[in-house]
C-alpha cells in the first residue's frame, strides 16, 4: 500500500534528523499502519464487489485495486481533453453492455456531460471527490478522503 510506504519513508527521514524522538516516531508509524489496515478492512467490507461504475477521469486505479471495485472506464484520461463523440459512444456501449450501476462526476469539473450520458442511458449518477476538496485538512485527511470516496461508491 502506497500510504504505508510513504509513512515509512517519512518516519525514517524524521528519525535520521531527530534521533532524540525515534521511539515516538516508531510508535506513531506502528499506530498509523494499524489504522490503515483497519481502514482497508472496513472499506473492503462496505463496498459491493459487483458494483460497476464509470468515472470522470482515470484517477482511481489504486483505489480500485486496493478495495476490489469495478471501474469499467473513464470519460477522459487527461482532464484537459474532454471526451469526443467516439469516446462517448464507447462509454454508452459499456454502460448498456456491462450493466453499469453508476457514472461519477467530480466537484471540480462541469457535470453536464455526465448528466447527458445518464439521461440517454438511465444509469444513476454520483459525485466522487478524489482530491478531498470538500474535506478539512488535518491529521485524518487521508482517512477522511478514502472514507468519503467509499461513501460515494456506496451511495450511488
Indicate residue ranges for each PLM-predicted region.
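Extracytoplasmic metal-acquisition and chelation regions
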Residues: 1-156
Amino acid at each position: 500500500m502506497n500510504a504505508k510506504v510513504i509513512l515509512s519513508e517519512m518516519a525514517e527521514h524524521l528519525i535520521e534528523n531527530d534521533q532524540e524522538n525515534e521511539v515516538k516516531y516508531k510508535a506513531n508509524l506502528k499506530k498509523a499502519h494499524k489504522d490503515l489496515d483497519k481502514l482497508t478492512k472496513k472499506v473492503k467490507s462496505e463496498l459491493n464487489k459487483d458494483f460497476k461504475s464509470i468515472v470522470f477521469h482515470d484517477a482511481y486505479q489504486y483505489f480500485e485495486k486496493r478495495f476490489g471495485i469495478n471501474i469499467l472506464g473513464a470519460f477522459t484520461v487527461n482532464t484537459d481533453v474532454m471526451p469526443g463523440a467516439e469516446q462517448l459512444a464507447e462509454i454508452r456501449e459499456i454502460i448498456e453492455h456491462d450493466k453499469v450501476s453508476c457514472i461519477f462526476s467530480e466537484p471540480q469539473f462541469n457535470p453536464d456531460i455526465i448528466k447527458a450520458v445518464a439521461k440517454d442511458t438511465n444509469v444513476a449518477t454520483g459525485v466522487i471527490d478524489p482530491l478531498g476538496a470538500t474535506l478539512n485538512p488535518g491529521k485524518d485527511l487521508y482517512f477522511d478522503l478514502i472514507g468519503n470516496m467509499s461513501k460515494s461508491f456506496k451511495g450511488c
